[in-house]
A protein has these predicted regions:
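Hydrophobic transmembrane alpha-helices
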Residues: 2-74
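Short helix-perturbing small/polar motifs within transmembrane alpha-helices
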Residues: 4, 18, 25, 93-134
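Short hydrophobic alpha-helical membrane-anchoring segments
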Residues: 24-32, 57-61, 81, 85, ...
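Membrane-interfacial segments
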Residues: 30-38, 63, 67, 87, ...
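Interfacial aromatic-anchored transmembrane helix boundaries in multi-pass membrane proteins
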Residues: 32-36, 40, 76-104
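Alpha-helical transmembrane segments of polytopic membrane proteins
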Residues: 43-49, 89-93, 155-169
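Hydrophobic, aromatic-enriched alpha-helical segments typical of multi-pass transmembrane helices
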Residues: 52-53, 70, 76, 80, ...
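Membrane-embedded alpha-helical hairpins and interfacial helices in multi-pass inner-membrane proteins
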Residues: 118-169
Length: 169
């Protein structure tokens, strides 16, 4: 009996790892496509949320549990830090992941309604990488220029991101 439980647990962990890896692949592919184009850069969180939604919902079906949701929410923010981005992304990713876990758990990981609401909050995990555009504006653009992006890119992003755009993101 104990061996059967371990096998089921191992399958769940493998499935969770697979879906987290698929989510990261979607994140990286969309990031590579969007990063050089200012308007796509600003749409990146929404594009990742849209294209990763089937992966998220399948993950909840095949590997229900808090750890897969939380790790999938936090790992991209750690990836951003590791690649030289401003390190405040986890300040948004951790609460977004925790809220997503609580909402999915409320529906016992089986309710489409609660899983969809959970995905909505989960998708905020990437917003931490964009928050500096508004709260650390000068530092963000200086850091972005030093990171190799063009002045034209920075000027376009600056023009497209007045304060009133923050709640729309």
């Amino acid at each position: 009996m104990d061996n059967q439980k371990n096998t089921k647990s191992s399958r769940g962990a493998i499935a969770a790892g697979l879906f987290i890896a698929l989510y990261l692949v979607i994140f990286v592919i969309i990031g590579v496509i969007c990063m050089p184009i200012a308007i796509l850069f600003l749409l990146m969180p929404e594009l990742v949320a849209f294209f990763a939604a089937p992966i998220y919902h399948t993950m909840l079906t095949k590997a229900p549990g808090w750890i897969s949701i939380f790790l999938a929410a936090v790992i991209p923010s750690l990836f951003l830090i590791a690649t030289g981005h401003i390190p405040i992304a986890p300040l948004v990713a951790v609460p977004a992941g925790l809220i997503a876990v609580l909402l999915a758990k409320k529906g016992q990981y089986k309710s489409f309604k609660w899983n969809a609401i959970s995905h909505m909050f989960f998708s905020l995990n990437l917003f931490g990488g964009f928050l500096p555009i508004w709260v650390m504006r000068d530092y963000f653009f200086q850091h972005t220029l030093e990171g190799g992006m063009s002045k034209a890119f920075c000027d376009t992003v600056r023009a497209l991101t007045p304060w009133w755009v923050l709640p729309l993101m």
